[in-house]
Amino acid sequence: MLKKDMNIADYDPELFKAIQNETLRQEEHIELIASENYTSPRVMEAQGSQLTNKYAEGYPGKRYYGGCEYVDVVETLAIERAKELFSATYANVQPHSGSQANSAVYMALLKPGDTVLGMNLAHGGHLTHGSPVNFSGKLYNIIPYGIDESGKIDYDEMERLAVEHKPKMMIGGFSAYSGIVDWAKMREIADKIGAYLFVDMAHVAGLIAAGVYPNPVPHAHVVTSTTHKTLAGPRGGVILSAADDEDLYKKLNSAVFPGGQGGPLMHVIAGKAVAFKEALEPEFKVYQQQVVNNAKAMVEVFLERGYKIVSGGTSNHLMLVDLIGRDLTGKEADAALGSANITVNKNSVPNDPRSPFVTSGVRIGTPAITRRGFKEAESKELTGWICDILDDANNPAVIERVKGQVLALCARFPVYG
């Protein structure tokens, strides 16, 4: 028999300890991985609800199982809020992840072997935009575009490649690009060759929702996103469109279910509904503007300390520190900073001579620290500590000093106060 007082601590202390340790790690480490964030207790409450028990294959009003009247309400709330948030006329909130949302778009719009123009992973793209190790690179003919010497997307090259190869689909979006993307220009190029424009806005969805980064939804045929990252919701995906094309919407729905998934995760969809409501609040706009302000403040200190930033700055939530020419790899920088309770990720940079497992760069993002309450002053102070370690990565005394400073700062700004 199930009882309400059942708990993990009594039943599975080994697992409980791991959960507690992760909670402590999050409180005592400064999180600078650009794709990570802290979701609200309301989102976690939704994910821990009895909605997890309900199978709901299909879509609201068209389910394959009975007893779906209340999960229909939940999913409809999520759909309508997503549409309002991004000025869309269509939303599918069922994808379990951003990658599965992307997979559904490929399935809906393309046939295996079709040509796709996507951003080079080494220049800031994403695995699902055509990497040879990903389904996208294995099933489709991928033509990569990249950035120019200034670190900005090369639209002239993009147009030349599009005209030459005539892809059926062009992909906008990135995982490590700090500039503003000209969605209108991309649509102009796509229209010139009769291609679909698909935008993966996963990294900047929160900024877009808040109006501090251009919205691709009015320009693209279809847009996907994760619901975590800057959006600060549960881990999951969403597909959006404002194309006013019912045939396209049907293809997208069919590609998600039954094409790629079975039953939706209703407890996660409830979490998405909560997160979308939170993103519609005025304070969310203040938060996202601060995310950008903090990123710019960090770049300022890196440049003052003599570090190179790919593209020379940032217009969003992330920056890529280029370590080419320094006696320090991205992997070594990642490890040294981690020893001081500062979490980043090694990342390839343009023209990187090192392997993707070693790299010559570090990717840094500000969504999580801003969620804790950091402003420009704390962001600059933190960047100084990072530079201290990068300047002397093999010095245990420097690492220990910075670790102490990090712990004190974390105590001042708890994740969940």
From Swiss-Prot:
Keywords: Amino-acid biosynthesis, Cytoplasm, One-carbon metabolism, Pyridoxal phosphate, Transferase. SUPFAM superfamilies: PLP-dependent transferases. It catalyses: (6R)-5,10-methylene-5,6,7,8-tetrahydrofolate + glycine + H2O = (6S)-5,6,7,8-tetrahydrofolate + L-serine. Its EC number is 2.1.2.1. Catalyzes the reversible interconversion of serine and glycine with tetrahydrofolate (THF) serving as the one-carbon carrier. This reaction serves as the major source of one-carbon groups required for the biosynthesis of purines, thymidylate, methionine, and other important biomolecules. Also exhibits THF-independent aldolase activity toward beta-hydroxyamino acids, producing glycine and aldehydes, via a retro-aldol mechanism. Its cofactor is pyridoxal 5'-phosphate. PROSITE patterns: SHMT. Homodimer. One of its GO terms (molecular function) is glycine hydroxymethyltransferase activity. One of its GO terms (cellular component) is cytosol. This is Serine hydroxymethyltransferase. The keyword Amino-acid biosynthesis applies. (6S)-5,6,7,8-tetrahydrofolate binds at L121, G125, H126, L127, S355, P356, F357. The modification N6-(pyridoxal phosphate)lysine is found at K229. It is an enzyme of class 2 (transferase). Pathway: One-carbon metabolism; tetrahydrofolate interconversion; Amino-acid biosynthesis; glycine biosynthesis; glycine from L-serine: step 1/1. InterPro entries: PyrdxlP-dep_Trfase, PyrdxlP-dep_Trfase_major, PyrdxlP-dep_Trfase_small, Ser_HO-MeTrfase, Ser_HO-MeTrfase-like, Ser_HO-MeTrfase_PLP_BS, SHMT-like_dom.
